[in-house]
C-alpha cells in the first residue's frame, strides 16, 4: 500500500446541497491531477482539482468576506479547487464547476464553497477542449 496523503478540512457551513456535512478529507487520487474530497463518514465523494490545471487565466471574483470566513490572512494560505463532474459517457465531456469553487485555508484547515461573481465562469466548464 503506497503512502496516501490526506488532509482533514473543517467546512463550518458545509457545501451547497450538503450543508449538514462539516468535515471532509482531501486525499490524493491515482488519476492526476485530480484529488478526492470525501466526507469523514465516507458517504459523499467529490473529484476535485485546481482550476489552474486546465484554465491558466482562471480569475474567480470571490468576495473578501468568503476569504475572511475561512480566516485567511495572506495569499500563501489560499487554495482554490473546483468540483469535477464525471457522470458522462465520454471523457471529453468531463466538466468543472467554475461558478462555485471550493476555497481552502491550507494553514488553518478550513474550507468553504464560494460563489464566483465572474460572469465568464460556468457550472459546467468543459475540461478537455476539442
Swiss-Prot record:
Its main location: cytoplasm. Keywords: Bacterial flagellum biogenesis, Chaperone, Cytoplasm, Translation regulation. It comes from the Bacteria. Pfam families: FliW. It is found in: Cytoplasm. Gene3D superfamilies: BH3618-like. The keyword Membrane does not apply. GO terms for cellular component: cytoplasm. One of its GO terms (biological process) is regulation of translation. The keyword Cytoplasm applies. Acts as an anti-CsrA protein, binds CsrA and prevents it from repressing translation of its target genes, one of which is flagellin. Binds to flagellin and participates in the assembly of the flagellum. Belongs to the FliW family. Interacts with translational regulator CsrA and flagellin(s). HAMAP family: FliW. This is Flagellar assembly factor FliW. The gene is fliW.
Amino acid at each position: 500500500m503506497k503512502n496516501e496523503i490526506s488532509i482533514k478540512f473543517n467546512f463550518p457551513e458545509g457545501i451547497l446541497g450538503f450543508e449538514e456535512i462539516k468535515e471532509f478529507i482531501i486525499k490524493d487520487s491515482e488519476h492526476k491531477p485530480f484529488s478526492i474530497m470525501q466526507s469523514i463518514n465516507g458517504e459523499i465523494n467529490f473529484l476535485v482539482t485546481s482550476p489552474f490545471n486546465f484554465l491558466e487565466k482562471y480569475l474567480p471574483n470571490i468576495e473578501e468576506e468568503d476569504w475572511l470566513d475561512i480566516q485567511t490572512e495572506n495569499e500563501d494560505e489560499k487554495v482554490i479547487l473546483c468540483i469535477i463532474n464525471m457522470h458522462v459517457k465520454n471523457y471529453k465531456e468531463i466538466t468543472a464547476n467554475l461558478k462555485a469553487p471550493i476555497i481552502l485555508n491550507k494553514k488553518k484547515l478550513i474550507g468553504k464553497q464560494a460563489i464566483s461573481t465572474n460572469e465568464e465562469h460556468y457550472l459546467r466548464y468543459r475540461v478537455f477542449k476539442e
